[in-house]
Amino acid sequence: MRAVVQRVTFSKVTVEGEIVGEIGKGLTVLLGVGCDDTEKDVEYLADKIVNLRIFEDENGKMNLSLKDVGGELLVVSQFTLYGDCRKGKRPSFDRAARPDTAKELYEKFVELCRSYDVKVETGKFQAMMMVEIHNDGPVTMLIDSKKEF
């Protein structure tokens, strides 16, 4: 399971002109599910992201988590994180999970994040979305549950 995690001041997702998810200060997570991902990957990534200390403390040091600052989470499914561009000019998505499996694990990830008592908004699975992200810093982290980065 892969995530692009961005610290934001504001973020929203629009589908067909309608806002389906919107947050203030917090994290926007672009989430990709791989073909061999399991619930263990969901658990690892949810815990890592909710407790990741990438917000500044009173000394300007990245020392506070989403929970510490009372931040919000916007989770957007993005299978293209599994695009393999090493061969040719067009990405291959062979390593991305099938849509039914990806949706199940995506929804488990969202529910697990909510269980940490964090406000979670989402995009719409398998929809064409417009994502507006106001990256704070910018601070952007790449996290892979298989530790491939």
Swiss-Prot record:
<dbReference type="GO" id="GO:0043908">
    <property type="term" value="F:Ser(Gly)-tRNA(Ala) hydrolase activity"/>
</dbReference>
<dbReference type="InterPro" id="IPR003732">
    <property type="entry name" value="Daa-tRNA_deacyls_DTD"/>
</dbReference>
<comment type="subunit">
    <text>Homodimer.</text>
</comment>
<protein>
    <recommendedName>
        <fullName>D-aminoacyl-tRNA deacylase</fullName>
        <ecNumber>3.1.1.96</ecNumber>
    </recommendedName>
</protein>
<dbReference type="GO" id="GO:0051500">
    <property type="term" value="F:D-tyrosyl-tRNA(Tyr) deacylase activity"/>
</dbReference>
<dbReference type="GO" id="GO:0106026">
    <property type="term" value="F:Gly-tRNA(Ala) deacylase activity"/>
</dbReference>
<keyword id="KW-0820">tRNA-binding</keyword>
<dbReference type="GO" id="GO:0019478">
    <property type="term" value="P:D-amino acid catabolic process"/>
</dbReference>
<dbReference type="InterPro" id="IPR023509">
    <property type="entry name" value="DTD-like_sf"/>
</dbReference>
<keyword id="KW-0378">Hydrolase</keyword>
<keyword id="KW-0963">Cytoplasm</keyword>
<comment type="function">
    <text>An aminoacyl-tRNA editing enzyme that deacylates mischarged D-aminoacyl-tRNAs. Also deacylates mischarged glycyl-tRNA(Ala), protecting cells against glycine mischarging by AlaRS. Acts via tRNA-based rather than protein-based catalysis; rejects L-amino acids rather than detecting D-amino acids in the active site. By recycling D-aminoacyl-tRNA to D-amino acids and free tRNA molecules, this enzyme counteracts the toxicity associated with the formation of D-aminoacyl-tRNA entities in vivo and helps enforce protein L-homochirality.</text>
</comment>
<dbReference type="GO" id="GO:0000049">
    <property type="term" value="F:tRNA binding"/>
</dbReference>
<feature type="short sequence motif" description="Gly-cisPro motif, important for rejection of L-amino acids">
    <location>
        <begin position="137"/>
        <end position="138"/>
    </location>
</feature>
<dbReference type="GO" id="GO:0005737">
    <property type="term" value="C:cytoplasm"/>
</dbReference>
<dbReference type="Pfam" id="PF02580">
    <property type="entry name" value="Tyr_Deacylase"/>
</dbReference>
<comment type="similarity">
    <text>Belongs to the DTD family.</text>
</comment>
<keyword id="KW-0694">RNA-binding</keyword>
